[in-house]
């Protein structure tokens, strides 16, 4: 009877071990989904080319559609005065490291197992950019980028990290575990911006 009890106890421990460690990757992946919520909207800041003398104008607003919240970037992009962008961005600062970056850096050995970023978006049919900066890109003109198309309906777009392009010739490849700045940008030409994002996730 004692041997049977000890055997049953061992089986329970083995089962507990399996459940904990088998579920851990799923838990980690679930935590790499970042729906836009009021409590985290403050981590996203609007910025335009006016910081460098441009004349583009716009705004980022927290909107709601039923139970879903989203960030909406609207404005007039102008290439006058060497400008040409409006954006909303989240970044690591000296005093703040948003949860999104914390989990990217902790997941899959500093992010090396992640394959791309997925957005739930809608817009006005224009083309927009995701721009990423890492600890190796400190100049404002150094970044990695990927474009995506929009329509008037909500849709998911996948942007594989190995398809991100560098703004600089011979810049080292994008190292996911080093991401420090993430932006959704209306960029590069004269047009009206209207793009909404309800969720950002990493896969």
Protein language model regions, located:
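Short alpha-helical "patches" and their helix-cap loops
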Residues: 1, 17-18, 198-201
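Exposed boundary/loop context
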Residues: 1, 21, 46-47
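Sec-dependent N-terminal signal peptides
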Residues: 14-22
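Generic short N-terminal amphipathic or hydrophobic helices
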Residues: 10-13, 25
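Short, Lys/Arg-enriched N-terminal segments with co-localized hydrophobic residues
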Residues: 2-10
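Beta-rich carbohydrate-recognition modules and glycan-binding surfaces
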Residues: 26-203
